[in-house]
Amino acid sequence: MASRQVSPVLVNRKLLFAGIFLVSLSGLVLEVAITRIFSAAIWYHFAFVAVSVALVGLGASGLVVQHRVKKLKGKWAENLTIYAAWGITMFVPITLFVMHALASQVIYLPLFMVLFSVPFFLIGIIISSAFNAFASVAGRLYAADLVGASAGALLVVLFLVLTGGEGATLVVGLIASISGVIFSRIAKNTKKTIASLAFVAFAISLILLNQATQIFAIPTDPTAQKDLPIYLREHPGSKIVKTQWNSFSRIDVVEGGTSSEGLVAKVFIDGGAGTNIISWDGNVS
């Protein structure tokens, strides 16, 4: 016999609202982080692609839940929220690594858009499933959704400064895995709770690994007609010696490859806006 769908009366509502809060938070963090990544890796005007990617993923998820998923029997809402949370945790690093491996080349932009739309699709699956299963508390769910989105819009600034664009995106996977733990507790499923905790550990390890090795570092498209790749192509021997993110851009410092007197290094903002760093002996005369 199929399992009976959990009634909102029997669900720990605080956990339910906390889960939706975290999922919505992760969605806004991801959307803003993508704008920064696309701007630095390809061109600044591709930053707005993030909005389209988010709308496609979220819109498709609503259609799927409305016309397909509701036909499933048993605790479909519980299972979908848990599996979708795991999927976000897995798919975010896969997407980053693909973009890293393909060197962010603009010819692969459609692929990057499809890959980044998948986490939004899964985020939408979670939120749509919750609204369908617990319509009686839709108002409070919506409030949790809005508060989470607001918090995400603020916290992403901190994540970008502390972990960079790639790190902030990996944080999305961590937040999603924590929501998976919450949804597993709602379902009172010990095995899935343990599995969700394993995903939390996995997400944390990826963040730490990236901080130590920059394994997910996304370069500027080497074929783009931007200041950074042009300078690297025209000056053999030059190399990026430091990369630092802030809340609105990525800064790359390049040294070597030039014999210009007094030129110590060049600084690039989002792969463009090249600026010289000139040596100075401190003598004002």
Regions found by a protein language model. Name each.
Residues 2-285:
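Alpha-helical transmembrane segments of multi-pass membrane proteins
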